[in-house]
Design a protein with these regions (language model features):
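N-terminal topogenic module of multi-pass integral membrane proteins
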Residues: 1-74, 178-193
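Small-residue packing motifs within transmembrane alpha-helices
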Residues: 13-21, 50, 57, 80, ...
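Transmembrane alpha-helical segments of multi-pass membrane proteins
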Residues: 19, 76-92, 132-143
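Membrane-helix interface and helix-disruption motif detector
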Residues: 32-53, 71-76, 89-110, 128-129, ...
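Hydrophobic cores of alpha-helical transmembrane segments in multi-pass inner/ER membrane proteins
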Residues: 53-64, 110-121, 167-180
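Membrane-helix interface "capping/anchor" motifs
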Residues: 67-80, 120-135
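Conserved mixed alpha/beta catalytic, RNA-binding, or beta-rich assembly cores of soluble enzyme
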Residues: 89-104, 115-125, 136-137, 141
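C-terminal transmembrane helix-loop-helix hairpin of multi-pass membrane proteins
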Residues: 125-193
Length: 193
C-alpha cells in the first residue's frame, strides 16, 4: 500500500512534469506547425482541436503517470488525466472560439484551469484544494501560454510554433506535476483518511 513517503517529491514532480509535458507539447505543436491546414481540411477546425486534445491526453498521461502512486497508477491515471485535460480543453476552446483574441485566450486559460483543478481535486478526493490547484494551473498556464506566444512571434514559422509548445508544456507540465504532488500528499493527511 503506498503512503505519504512514496509520493514523488515536489522537486521531482515539478521537473518531471515540466520536462515530460514539454516534450508532449512539442510533439503536439509540431503537428500544428506542419499539419494544421491539412487537419483543418480533413477534420474541420473543431475536429483538429479534438485531435490535438486526444494527442495531449495520450502522450501526457504517459509522461505524467510516473508521478502518481497507488490507485491512480497507469492505466487508471489515464482516465483521470483524460477527464482533466478534456475539461481544460473544452473550457479553453469554448471561450476562445466564442470571444477570440486575447480575451478568449486568457478567459479560456482561466476556465480551463479551474475545470482541470476540479477534476483533479475530485479524483484525489481533496476538494478543499480546488482553489490552490486552480491558482497553480492558471498562473503557470498563463506564463507558459503567453511567453510561448511571444517566443513564437519572435521566431515565427515552424520553429516558433514548436518553441511555443516547449515553453507552454514546460510551465503547464510543472504545474500539473505540482498539483499531482499536493493532491497525493493531501490524501494522506488524517482529515482525508
Amino acid at each position: 500500500m503506498p503512503n505519504h513517503n512514496s509520493v514523488p517529491s515536489l522537486t521531482r514532480s515539478l521537473i518531471a512534469g515540466g520536462l515530460g509535458f514539454s516534450l508532449v507539447a512539442l510533439c503536439v505543436f509540431a503537428t500544428v506547425a506542419t499539419g494544421e491546414v491539412w487537419l483543418y481540411r480533413k477534420l474541420t477546425v473543431y475536429g483538429a482541436y479534438l485531435f490535438w486534445t486526444a494527442l495531449f491526453i495520450l502522450l501526457g498521461g504517459l509522461a505524467l503517470g510516473s508521478l502518481v502512486v497507488g490507485r491512480w497508477r497507469l492505466p487508471k491515471f489515464y482516465l483521470l488525466f483524460g477527464l482533466a485535460f478534456f475539461a481544460y480543453a473544452f473550457g479553453w476552446t469554448a471561450l476562445y472560439f466564442a470571444l477570440r483574441g486575447f480575451h478568449g485566450q486568457w478567459l479560456g486559460l482561466l476556465v480551463g484551469s479551474i475545470l482541470m483543478a476540479i477534476v483533479f481535486a475530485a479524483g484525489f478526493r481533496v476538494m478543499r484544494s480546488i482553489l490552490k490547484f486552480a491558482a497553480l494551473l492558471f498562473v503557470a498556464n498563463w506564463i507558459g501560454y503567453f511567453w510561448g506566444a511571444d517566443v513564437n512571434d519572435r521566431f515565427g514559422g515552424t520553429a516558433g510554433l514548436m518553441l511555443w509548445g516547449v515553453v507552454y508544456g514546460l510551465f503547464l507540465g510543472a504545474a500539473i506535476g505540482a498539483v499531482l504532488h499536493y493532491a497525493q500528499v493531501q490524501q494522506w493527511k488524517p482529515e482525508n483518511s
